[in-house]
């Protein structure tokens, strides 16, 4: 696969071609994902749940994410790598710079932070120093205790209006990508149209510029057996993991996934 860059992803948005993203934590799955045509690999703090067995992402550390980012880099064959800054890993500007530097040195092409308009200063300072940033909005798992659980965000008009304004403000601050998790499909479509940067969705309908799922979820692997509404098991009916990954790419590119049943209404 030719090297995917931020310019490539921006071009896909302009052309109206959907972007494919999956979480990835090791070299073997990085290689397999690239072979199937996955364009973006997200080294997510979700590893705390699907690899470590924790009940949230909060225990994950920057050093653990750097370790897995380096592993993904070694198996990567052209995909764009995004790495999460973990819970409290960007509480101060000094922490933000130090931890973002670790992840970029480990092999990330972009770092992802969770939050809203309060992230603007950190995003601006990182962007000015050559670190591309993805702003993760909507349901932000690192804030699960504040949010009162894993709930759809932006369902009332005040929340929706604020989220639209925050997305525009974060783009203006320098965010090069936005990820929307568990927001009403109509709101996600509005935000996607309102900003020029690529918008990736998970539980955000089909109108975003691309889709992401947790690798283990889309392969039907779960410790708890609880499957989010927005997940589809792509192993069903497939002979191999490669076929499942390829089916995901085909359905995202063909805009057959996600279906209406995978999204949320206001």
Swiss-Prot record:
Active site per database record: 181 (proton acceptor)
GO CC terms of this entry: cytoplasm
Enzyme class: transferase
CDD domains the UniProt entry points to: KPHMT-like (cd06557)
This protein's pathway: Cofactor biosynthesis; (R)-pantothenate biosynthesis; (R)-pantoate from 3-methyl-2-oxobutanoate: step 1/2
Positions of Mg(2+) binding: 45, 84, 114
EC number(s) on file: 2.1.2.11
Cofactor note: Binds 1 Mg(2+) ion per subunit.
Name of this protein: 3-methyl-2-oxobutanoate hydroxymethyltransferase
């Amino acid at each position: 696969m030719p090297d995917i860059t931020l310019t490539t992803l921006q071009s896909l948005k302009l052309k109206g071609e959907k972007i494919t993203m999956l979480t990835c934590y090791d070299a073997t799955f990085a290689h397999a994902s690239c072979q199937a045509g996955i364009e973006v690999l997200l080294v997510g703090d979700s590893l705390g749940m699907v690899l470590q067995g924790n009940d949230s992402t909060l225990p994950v550390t920057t050093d653990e994410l750097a370790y897995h980012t380096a592993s993904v880099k070694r198996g990567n064959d052209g995909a764009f790598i995004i790495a999460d800054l973990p819970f409290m890993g960007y509480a101060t500007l000094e922490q933000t710079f130090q931890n973002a530097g670790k992840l970029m040195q480990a092999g990330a092409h972009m770092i992802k932070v969770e939050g809203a308009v309060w992230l603007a200063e950190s995003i601006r300072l990182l962007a000015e120093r050559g670190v591309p940033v993805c702003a993760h909005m909507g349901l932000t798992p690192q804030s699960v205790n504040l949010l009162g659980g894993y709930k759809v965000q932006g369902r009332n008009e005040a929340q929706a209006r604020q989220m639209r304004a925050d997305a525009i403000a974060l783009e203006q601050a320098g965010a090069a990508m936005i990820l929307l998790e568990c927001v009403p499909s109509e709101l996600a479509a509005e935000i996607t149209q309102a900003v020029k940067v690529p918008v990736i969705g998970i539980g955000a309908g089909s109108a975003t510029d691309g889709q992401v799922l947790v690798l283990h979820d889309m392969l039907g692997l779960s410790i708890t057996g609880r499957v989010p509404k927005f997940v589809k098991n792509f192993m069903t009916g497939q002979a191999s993991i490669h076929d499942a990954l390829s089916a995901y790419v085909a359905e995202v590119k063909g805009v057959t996934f996600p279906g209406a049943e995978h999204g949320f209404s206001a």
